[in-house]
Amino acid sequence: MLMKRIIPCLDVKEGRVVKGVKFQNLRDLGDPVAVAKYYYEQGADELVLLDISATQEGRDTMLDIVERVAEVIYMPFTVGGGIKTLEDAKRLIRAGADKVSLNSSALQNPQLIQDISRLFGVQATVVAIDAKRTGDSWGVFSHGGTQAVGRDAIEWAKEAVSLGAGELLVTSMDADGTKDGYDLELIQRLREVVNVPLIASGGVGTLEHLAEGLEAGADAALAASIFHEATYTMPETKDYLKARGVNVR
């Protein structure tokens, strides 16, 4: 049985770690290299670095930050934000990223998923889906959660996997930043239709929420606020999950 992973998420804007509630009201949380090193030393399984300004403002992704992070941590990390071409992905992986995460660009050019997975393997190809509930289904949003794209999240997840996505990072926009817990139904529905690892994101406020997401079928639990605000340490988190019977490192 595969170990479940705990993944802190660093939202990076203009070279600093920030955390917003529902993609708004960003607060500065410091230098991404220092924050990444802290989580590595705490025992996180992986990291996700999302350049949340890149896609919206057409910025180049943060190559220098990626190079510096790769020098201080020895665990897998994923980089997303503003990856529009195969060349963008190549530069990030050469700079030290283990995986790249596509969101808006994959919706605009699904072929990019295939191109990256063929060159670097499915294990290096993550597709991030920002999903918002409408009745019994979920719609997909792009450009940092600002634009509805008129696609069903479950169908898009299946298509992304068929094109070569080796992992899906799924954020519930309804839950994001609320600290009320993951959208468990979204995780369960995705688990029924795709066979690649799922990273649950959006809404964690307690350790119980992390456990619920993993028990609902996610392979990894991503969180920001509870770790950035030092509500819980990584060792505390792992101890709680182990005691609950969740298979973690």
Curated annotation (Swiss-Prot):
Q: Which GO terms describe its cellular component?
A: cytoplasm
- Enzyme Commission identifier(s): 4.3.2.10
Q: Which reaction does it catalyse?
A: 5-[(5-phospho-1-deoxy-D-ribulos-1-ylimino)methylamino]-1-(5-phospho-beta-D-ribosyl)imidazole-4-carboxamide + L-glutamine = D-erythro-1-(imidazol-4-yl)glycerol 3-phosphate + 5-amino-1-(5-phospho-beta-D-ribosyl)imidazole-4-carboxamide + L-glutamate + H(+)
Quote the CDD domains the UniProt record gives: HisF
GO MF annotations, alphabetized: imidazoleglycerol-phosphate synthase activity; lyase activity
The compartments listed are:
Cytoplasm
Sorted alphabetically, which InterPro entries does this protein's record hold?
Answer: Aldolase_TIM (IPR013785), His_biosynth (IPR006062), HisF (IPR004651), IGPS_HisA/HisF (IPR050064), RibuloseP-bd_barrel (IPR011060)
Query: Which UniProt keywords are present, listed alphabetically?
Result: Amino-acid biosynthesis, Cytoplasm, Histidine biosynthesis, Lyase
Entry's Gene Ontology BP terms: L-histidine biosynthetic process
Q: Does the keyword Hydrolase apply?
A: no
Which residues are the active-site ones?
D11, D130
| Pathway(s) the chain acts in | Amino-acid biosynthesis; L-histidine biosynthesis; L-histidine from 5-phospho-alpha-D-ribose 1-diphosphate: step 5/9
Against Pfam families, the record matches this protein to: His_biosynth
Query: Which superkingdom?
Result: Bacteria
Family from the record: Belongs to the HisA/HisF family.
Spell out the HAMAP family in the cross-references: HisF
- Function, as annotated: IGPS catalyzes the conversion of PRFAR and glutamine to IGP, AICAR and glutamate. The HisF subunit catalyzes the cyclization activity that produces IGP and AICAR from PRFAR using the ammonia provided by the HisH subunit.
Q: Describe its partners and assembly state.
A: Heterodimer of HisH and HisF.
Please name the PANTHER family in this protein's record: IMIDAZOLE GLYCEROL PHOSPHATE SYNTHASE HISHF, IMIDAZOLE GLYCEROL PHOSPHATE SYNTHASE SUBUNIT HISF/H IGP SYNTHASE SUBUNIT HISF/H
Q: What is this protein called?
A: Imidazole glycerol phosphate synthase subunit HisF
Q: Which gene encodes it?
A: hisF
